[in-house]
Regions:
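N-terminal helical cap/lid subdomain that shapes the substrate entry/recognition surface
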Residues: 2-98
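Conserved Lys-Pro-Asp/Glu-containing loop-to-beta segment of HAD-superfamily phosphomonoesterases
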Residues: 2-4, 136-165
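Conserved SAM-binding loop
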Residues: 13, 102, 133, 157-158, ...
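Short amphipathic alpha-helical segments
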Residues: 18-19, 113-116, 169-171, 189-190, ...
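Substrate-recognition/cap helix-loop segment adjacent to the acidic, metal-dependent catalytic center
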Residues: 29-31, 53-59, 79, 87-101, ...
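Short acidic capping loops at alpha-helix termini that bridge into adjacent secondary structure
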Residues: 35-40, 120-124, 152-156
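Structural recognition of alpha->loop->beta junctions
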Residues: 118-128, 187-207
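Acidic, Mg2+-coordinating phosphoryl-transfer loop and its flanking beta/alpha structural elements
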Residues: 156-195
Length: 209
């Protein structure tokens, strides 16, 4: 029986496409790279940060990451907007007694949840700086399970990318794949999704709330 719901943030709970586009173009202007469009960003939303940059700009430099974390993220964080019904789903899940968590490749997820006004719903949140290895390695989800004292069999992870599905599979957790970014149902299923839905709003049957 599922009693723990774990969520990715980007393109799962929130539409962060504009935030990513603005952030990418801040990077482009600062480092003399090609500026990108919304369509460019949509095509790489489900990649890791390194893959995101390598696809857009053909490379990865350590100084980019430092600038991204310390300059870009604080300035674009407010541009992410909750998807319709996302907060209602969190509220409903909490009332039904579910434990709620976040596992994201963002750093400092509690700060993001606070900006979005939804930190109050979550029992724990784990980001890329809290574990040795980011997704698709299972470290984040295993950390969530350990912190909450729950078994993998009682948890479900919701995300929008094959990366999320592989992370869940590696942790032995069932997963819900959402086609809210650029991943197709086939891509999510091939990566191990237990169920696929177009959005959180259409996934209440899977979530149980």
């Amino acid at each position: 029986m599922i009693n723990t719901l774990i969520f990715d943030i980007d393109m799962t709970l929130v539409d962060s496409l504009d935030a990513c586009r603005v952030g990418a173009n801040m990077m482009a202007r600062n480092f003399g790279l090609r500026e990108v469009t919304r369509e460019d960003v949509l095509k790489v939303m489900t990649l890791t940060t390194r893959e995101f940059w390598e696809t857009l700009w053909g490379g990865f430099e350590p100084e980019w990451l430092d600038y991204f974390v310390h300059v870009v993220v604080p300035q674009v964080r407010h541009l992410s907007k909750m998807f319709p019904e996302a907060e209602d789903i969190l509220k409903s899940a909490k009332k039904r007694g579910f434990l709620l968590a976040v596992a994201t490749n963002r750093a400092n997820p509690w700060l993001d949840l606070g900006v979005l006004g939804i930190a109050k719903y979550f029992d724990t949140a784990v980001g890329c700086t809290d574990v040795p290895r980011p997704k698709p390695e299972p470290d984040m989800l295993l950390t969530v399970l350990r912190q909450l004292g729950v078994e993998a069999s009682s948890a479900l992870y919701a995300g929008d990318s094959p990366l999320d599905m592989r992370c869940a599979a590696a942790a032995g957790i069932r997963s819900l794949g959402l086609t809210q970014s650029d991943a197709t149902p086939g891509m999510l299923s091939a990566a191990g999704a237990s169920a696929v839905r177009p959005s959180l709003a259409e996934a209440r049957d899977v979530l149980g709330c």
